[in-house]
Regions:
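Short, surface-exposed loop or secondary-structure junction motifs
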Residues: 66, 119-317
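Short, gly/Ser/Thr-rich active-site loops of penicillin-recognizing serine hydrolases
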Residues: 303-305, 340-362
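Bacterial N-terminal signal peptides
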Residues: 1-4
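Short, well-ordered beta-strand elements
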Residues: 321-340
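Short, conserved catalytic-motif segment at the N-terminal edge
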Residues: 20-81, 103
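Short active-site loop at a secondary-structure junction
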Residues: 39-47, 69-126, 167-180, 245-248, ...
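A short acidic/small-residue loop/turn micro-motif
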Residues: 63-67, 241, 340-342
Length: 362
């Protein structure tokens, strides 16, 4: 067993230098000390990547991907991205729209005719920006229609949707975070591509970018992959092993995600206009109590706070993930971990140092 690490944030004790190179040196020294604790513990770990003004200033990892075999984490170790899968799903759908293979304002039911007729007004755009009104299936896993479906997949979910006869609100009138929306987006993308969701991602994005350590849940994981195992108290959510794809279910490595984020910001996955659309909130209403708003696959800061910033975190079993970009401060970072609450304090402090040294720099 391993205990939760508790680390005191003490950035205020160090004066943040004005010179960029000095800030980078301070950041590296500080985060190295943090990650070294994981290596000493010989438990689950973390991988961290930071880019500032187009320069990769940090790309390191610590801890074990697989404790039993003493396999360490490295830049090619794959992690389940959990909800940080959503930006990748949204970018694929946007790319398909820009290629003319689907339209954002088409009804979802056009692509998925098995959907309940009362969902007929829901568009692909509504699904992307969380304004569809479909209740989140994650909140219904204890229902009689879902309980016992161990290994729950997208297809099973479509067949047994608990709330198929109602919506929480009329599409486009409110914003509400729902994993259900991204299950439908994955299925729509599959239909538009004429392939499975994973194959569509691989052919259109992963292979062109050289992302050789990225896949989806349903694909074979034996192709030389070193998977960071999930070290949590349970590998199930309310008694069910989830194998849904789109909102979650994408596995990737630090090196691959860095390729993806750099290509995304350079307009190589979707156009620059597309990235602007994806990082613009459709409604001013917050999607979370903390005030964040939602774009298309991205969580955006509250109004008038950190303009140009977009992020998405993920949490599933022992996996804790985060992808963050900023087109104003030009600070981008990725954090992947497999130790649940054991490593969460470390991730929090790494984020603190990023914000204090780079995002809040003079």
């Amino acid at each position: 067993m391993f205990s939760v690490l508790s680390i005191g944030v003490n950035a205020e004790e160090s004066q943040v230098p004005a010179n960029k190179n000095d800030r980078i040196a301070l950041f590296r020294e500080s985060v190295d000390k943090i990650l070294n604790q994981l290596d000493r513990k010989q438990g689950p770990g973390m991988a961290v990547w930071v880019e500032v003004d187009g320069e990769v200033v940090y790309s390191k990892w610590a801890g074990l991907a697989q404790r039993e075999k003493r396999i360490p984490i490295d830049g090619d170790t794959t992690f389940e991205l959990a909800s940080a899968s959503k930006p990748l799903t949204a970018a694929l759908v946007m790319q398909l729209a820009e290629a003319g293979l689907l339209q954002l304002d088409e009804a979802a039911i056009k692509w998925l005719p098995e959907l309940p007729p009362v969902w007929g007004a829901i568009t692909i755009r509504n699904l992307l920006n969380q304004t569809a009104g479909i209740p989140d299936y994650m909140s219904q896993i204890n229902s009689t229609k879902l309980l016992g479906l161990d290994g729950l997949t997208n297809k099973q979910l479509l067949q047994r949707w608990e709330t198929g006869n109602r919506l929480n609100f009329n599409p486009g009138t409110q914003v509400e975070y729902s994993n259900s929306n991204y299950v439908l987006l994955a299925e729509i993308a599959s239909s538009a591509c004429g392939t499975g969701f994973g194959q569509c991602l691989r052919q259109r994005i992963f292979e062109p970018l050289g992302m050789t350590h990225t896949r989806v849940e349903s694909e074979d994981s034996s192709r030389g992959e070193v998977l960071a195992l999930n070290y949590a108290l349970s590998k199930k959510t309310k008694g069910i092993l989830l194998k849904t794809e789109g909102p979650t279910g994408i596995y990737s490595s630090l090196n691959d995600l860095a390729l993806w984020l750099q290509a995304y910001q350079a307009g190589k996955i979707v156009s620059k206009a597309g990235t602007i659309l994806m990082t613009t909130p459709v409604l001013s209403s917050p999607v979370f109590e903390s005030g964040e708003r939602y774009g298309m696959g991205w969580v955006l800061p509250p109004e008038d706070n950190k303009i140009g910033s977009y992020t998405h975190a993920g949490q599933k079993d022992g996996y804790r993930t985060l992808i963050s970009g900023n087109t104003t401060d030009h600070v981008n970072y990725i954090i992947l971990s497999n130790g649940g609450d054991f490593v969460q304090p470390i991730s929090t402090e790494v984020q603190y140092w990023i914000q204090e040294i780079f995002e809040a720099a003079p």
